Structure formats: structure tokens, C-alpha cells
Amino acid sequence: MWKLKIGDGGKDRNIFSTNNFVGRQTWEFDPDAGTSQEKAQVEAARQHFYDNRFEVKACSDLLWRFQILKEKNFKQTIESVKIKDEEEISEENVAITLRRAVHHLSTLQSNDGHWPALNAGPLFYFPPLVFCMYVTGHLDSIFPYEYRKEILRYIYCHQNEDGGWGLHVEGHSIMFCTVLNYICMRILGEGPNGGKEDACARARKWIHDHGSVTHVSSWGKIWLSVLGIFDWCASNPMPPEFWMLPSFLLKHPAKMLCYCRLVYMPMSYLYGKRFVGPITPLILMLREELLTQPYEKVNWKKTRHLCAKEDLYYPHPLIQDLIWDSLYIFVEPLLTHWPFNKLLREKALQTVMKHIHYEDENSRYITIGCVEKVLCILACWVEDPNGDAFKKHLARLPDYLWVSEDGMTLHSFGSQTWDASLIIQALLATNLIEDVGPILTKAHEFIKKSQVRDNPSGDFKSMYRHISKGSWTFSDKDHGWQVSDCTAESLKCCLLLSMLPPEIVGEKMEPEMLYDSVNILLSLQGKKGGLPAWEPSEAVEWLELFNPIEFLEEIVVEREYVECTSSAIQALVLFKKLYPEHRKKEVENFIANAVRFLEYKQTSDGSWYGNWGICFTYGSWFALNGLVAAGKTYDNCAAIRKGVEFLLTTQREDGGWGESHLSSSKKIYVPLERSQSNIVQTSWAIMGLIHAGQMERDPTPLHRAVKLIINFQQEEGDWPQQELTGVFMKNCMLQYAMYRDIFPTWALAEYRRRILLASPAVAI
């Protein structure tokens, strides 16, 4: 039976930590664990998900919940309430619903103070890891039978009815993910016509019906070249010499978005080496199964620009293809032959590996994310199959694996700190401080221990890194990568908790550590007044013309984001209240410029585009909160009035809100097709309206929405998993499994605190 271990570093000498593994979460299979009843519960959950996989495509993350609720002997002792038509919403009913939610949410907390949860959804994450382990000869040791079974379960659970796989679990089938998952099944032991419900045959038919494997997008071409199914001539050039360019150039790596930089860094190494794994009998079979003509007869260079229409979200501009062709025809032949292969190529490869090792060491071999992690593992193995770097990478693989009722997947990377910072604020909003004191104490300790205390090592600027001292990451301290909104939300938590008695919530954070957090937020503000996510946004935006990834957008350079800007405003306004003299003028200027940015980013319909949540509902909640925190009101700010109008006009018949993930991709508001609202998005809208003072004008829309949330609460005190509500790079959706617990609780808390405590009963 699968068990989640918290804060466990294991006994591998190749793993190390900066904070004793606080926040680390790793799954382990124990054949002797679990009673027959517990195993039956898990099997029932698996079967239920599979039977309903086309109705609700995101899992409910039940295996961890089963485990922790059992360990803590959880039983919901507070009876539920339901609000009937025309019945009044009383403070008592809301308080009961809140206490049920808090009781359940508190039980889900781990011993080190965070809330473990799934953070996944893309379907191109896991197959490359399987490919990497196959190529390096470590497939059997890393993925024994029970692991393979769960990986395959996940693949089967998320195969679309047409036989393909989407970019994410709710997406339409695309060539990239269908090819990757087909090959993954074959490597894991399924025959050409094997797999559950003819999974392999159906997938192969989809591939051939949509232009064949040569129409896979660029990342697919790279991985198939590594495997030996394609020739490297099918890939556009990724010369490692790029990393030797002078820093004054506009297209220097230092000016790239960190994720783009750290994906193409190991890719350029593999390309520069033209690395190909062992050509095994299976690889030869895959060539026959996927290609429509013999491998030797394929004109590989003509496939470079092929891409299935289903994959094509960001078509390459003509200028980009011209550059690829120029590099392919004129530059690469020079760099791969004497004397340039000795003078430049070998030196460039060494430079790239220097950067890879630096990034690995500064993230404790977690790396910035799962896509980069797998590529860096392979690059380290290619450089030295017996080297320490490869061994250290393997030791950190468990940090990415997650098991749910739909099988085993890879996290983007954990959301430990992000989730904890939101939950703390939700619990504080309940005003049930005596009920949640011990929970807040542990969470407070986790947040304090998770702050990054140092900048990256050595001359970090020469390695294209920004300061990180005082920041918080998305996951845990060991990860090391500063994130602006995670820093702002965690700083806000520390400030809020410092205002409560230490005997209830623990000792407050030292002021110097708070100052460090303020420093990093101030350092990140861009020219437009907004905040990027990771590093200063210094590059020109037209560099996006060179985005080589067909299925993502705004991936080349760092941008300024509404959500990050709002979080920073809220944190710095509170900081200014508690520490009014620290960098006073700079903080005031920051807030003023950030407000102007939020007003500038508002769309014509009054909404704000959300970059990290779906979509205009999410962005509008953040923007309204930021503007109000800065002192703006409905009466004195046209942006708030327009934002409120947008939310009111998108409220649905059942009282809630429901926005499709297509809003993110199409960049226009698209409602959910089904009539039922999304509880998480409803919660965002409620909080946005409350902060904008809707209760003072007409509270009826709020009452209708809260009634929906109360009536949707489940027996144990949580809410059901519905559609995905996270997103990145415009087109790829992400599941935050804790959102269904966090935001309804938070919205009810704000409603009770700001409305009902002043009005004993409300008729709707």
C-alpha cells in the first residue's frame, strides 16, 4: 500500500538539505501496510475515478487524505446544514459550515505544518522521465512493478475517448502528448496492441490519423531523437554556443525567462552532443509502429517545421523559421566540423554543463521544475554516467512523484509554501483563533523555516541569477527559487501572525528577516509598476517572436503579472502599517506604481486576465484586493467599479461563477458549458466583491453565492473536486488539489466576518 512520508531524507548519502527536509513529501510503497478494509477503500476510489473519468477529469487526491484522516482518527462530529429555497442564511448556519470546514482542513495538516497535496495535470510531464531512465539503464531500479502499475494507471485514466491524450487532463488530444504516452506505455511493457481497453492500438490509430509521428511538436522531436526513433536532423538547431554570447546582446540567456532558459540549457547540451540512447529492439519496433516509411528513407530535415494542427497554439512567425533555417544550413555545419568543433563546440558544452551543475547545486538537485529536472538528469548522465551529479539527481526524484486514485504522476514541483500561505490566511479570516491556534502555530513554524536565508552561491549574477535572500519559494526552502507572490503571501502571513499573541500562534519572525523579504519585492518591480514572478523583467517583449514552443505562450521573457503585483501591494501595505519607517519612501512609491499597473492592465470589459488561475475571475479577485488594500474604493476608483460590474454580470443562475479554461487560451471570457458553477471560482468572486464593498450596495449576489457554497459542502466538511482552476503560460492547465478546501473556507469566513456578524439573518 502506498504511504506518504513527510520530512524524510532517507539514508542516501547523495541527498542533502538546508533545513532538515522540512516540507519534503515522498511516496513509498509498503507491501505490508494497510488493512483489507483500507485497501478496499483505495480500490473503490480508483474504480470510481476510472468509471467517471470523462465527467470529472481531475482526481480528488484521495490516497493522502485517506492516510492522514485515518492516522488522526478523523470523524466529522458537526452536523451539516443545507439552506433551502427562500430560507434565511444565519450567522449560525455559516459558522457551522465554517467549523466543519476548519475541522477537516486542520486534519489535513502534516506534522511539519504544511498541507501536502497534488500539484499536477499536464500530460507531458511523466513520459520523458521514463525515457530518461530507459536510456540510462535505470528503469527497473527506479520504477519497479508497483510504480509501473501506477504510472500506467495514470496514463489509462487520462486517455481521451478518441484514443489520444491532451496537453493536460482536460485538454483535447494533441500529437505531442499522444506520442509521448504511447511510447511510455511501450517502454513500461505494454505490447503494440496492449494496454487497458486497447489503449496502445487506439493511440497509434490516433497518431496515424492525424498526420503521423513526424507531425509531433518540437519538444517531441527532441525526445524522439534522444531515444533514436528520430534523427537529430528533425530538430531545429539549439547550439550550445548560445551560452557563450556576450551579455549586451538582446537575446542573451540572462534575458530569458528562467524556465525557458533552464529547459533549453540541457536541451542544447544534448543537441550539441547529438546524444542518442541505445538502439534496442524496442526502439526499432517503435520506428516501425510510428513512422509511415522506413527510418532510413525519411527526409528528416523536411520534418523540422511540421506540427499537427491540434498542437499548434503558438505558430512560429516567419522570421523565427528563417532563423532556424539559417542556423541549420549555414551555422551548424561549421560548428560541428574541425576546427570549430574543437575551438567552440567543446568549450560551449563545458560552459553549459557549468551552468547546469550550478543550478543543480543551488536547488539541492531538485532543479526549478520537473521538465528541467529530467533534462538535467540526462545531461549529467551523458557527461558522466557514474558521476556524483547523476546520483544526486536520482536521490531527489521522489520529491516529484505523487500517487492518487488515478495513479502516479509528476508534480510540476510541490506547492507546499504557496498552499500553506493561503490556508493560514483562510484560517485567520475565520476568527476562530482559539479553535485553530495549534494549527496556526505549526503552520507559522513551517513558514518561518521555509524562508530562503541566502542568495545563490558565488558570483550568482554571472550565472544569470537574481537575489533570493528573504524570499519564499513555491515549494520548500531546498528548492531555492524565489517567487514574488509566494514571498508576498508568506510575508503577509508572518505580519498577520505577529499581531496575535505568541502563546497562541508562536513567536513572530525577526524584523530583519521581514526586511529581507521587503528588499526582494522592491527589487523585482518592473518599469510598468508590476511584478514578475521570478526575476526582474528587463528584456524586450518582442523577443517572444522567438518562442520555439508551439503549445505555450509568453515563455521567452519574464513579464509583469496582475496577481504578483496585487500580492505585493497587500503585503507592503500591511508592512508599512507595522513598520512605517523602514524604506518608507521606496515602499510608498512601489505601491503607487503598482496601483497604476493594475489600473493599466484592466481589460475593456472591466476584468483582469489571470496568468496563474482561470482566468478573468481569478485575475479580477486579485486586482480588486490589491486596489482596495492600497486605499482605493468603489466611489473613488473607476477600475473597481468596472471590475465589480464584470463580476456581477458573469454571475450564473445558480448564484455562483463558472469560467472555462478556454478563457486562458483564447484570452476572452468563456463560461463553463455545464450549468453548475465552480465552487473555487465562486469563492474568488465572493471575496473580490466583498473587498470592493458590495455588501454596502446590494448584498443579494453575495447571499446567493454563499448559499451555493454551503449547500455544496460534503459530509466530511470539504468540497468536491471540479474543473481545474490553475494555469500557466496561457495554455496549460494545472490542478491545485487544496484549492477546493482553501477558497470556500476563506470566502465563507470573509462573508461571516464582514456581513453576518453585523446582520443576524439574511433572506434570499
From Swiss-Prot:
Q: Tell me which family the UniProt entry assigns to this protein.
A: Belongs to the terpene cyclase/mutase family.
Would the keyword Isomerase be found if you checked this record's keyword annotation? Answer: yes
**Catalytic residues in the record:** 485 (proton donor)
Which enzyme class?
isomerase
Instruction: Note one Pfam family from the annotation.
Output: SQHop_cyclase_C
Protein name per its UniProtKB record = Mixed-amyrin synthase
Recorded hits in InterPro entries, A to Z, give:
SQ_cyclase_C, SQ_cyclase_N, Squalene_cyclase, Terpene_synthase_CS, Terpenoid_cyclase/PrenylTrfase
Q: Which regions are annotated as PFTB repeats?
A: 148-189, 514-556, 591-631, 640-681
GO terms (molecular function) for this protein are: alpha-amyrin synthase activity; beta-amyrin synthase activity
Sorted alphabetically, the keyword list is: Isomerase, Repeat
Question: What Gene3D superfamilies does the annotation carry?
Answer: 1.50.10.20
Give me the reactions it catalyses.
Answer: (S)-2,3-epoxysqualene = beta-amyrin; (S)-2,3-epoxysqualene = alpha-amyrin
Question: Lineage of the native species?
Answer: Eukaryota, Viridiplantae, Streptophyta, Embryophyta, Tracheophyta
Q: Which GO terms describe its biological process?
A: pentacyclic triterpenoid biosynthetic process
The record's function comment reads: Multifunctional oxidosqualene cyclase producing alpha- and beta-amyrin and several other minor triterpenes.
Question: EC number(s) for this protein?
Answer: 5.4.99.39, 5.4.99.40
Q: Name one GO cellular component term.
A: lipid droplet
Q: Could you tell me the gene encoding this protein? A: OSCPSM
Q: Which CDD domains match?
A: SQCY_1
Q: Specify the species.
A: Pisum sativum (Garden pea)
PANTHER family hit by this protein: BETA-AMYRIN SYNTHASE-RELATED, TERPENE CYCLASE/MUTASE FAMILY MEMBER
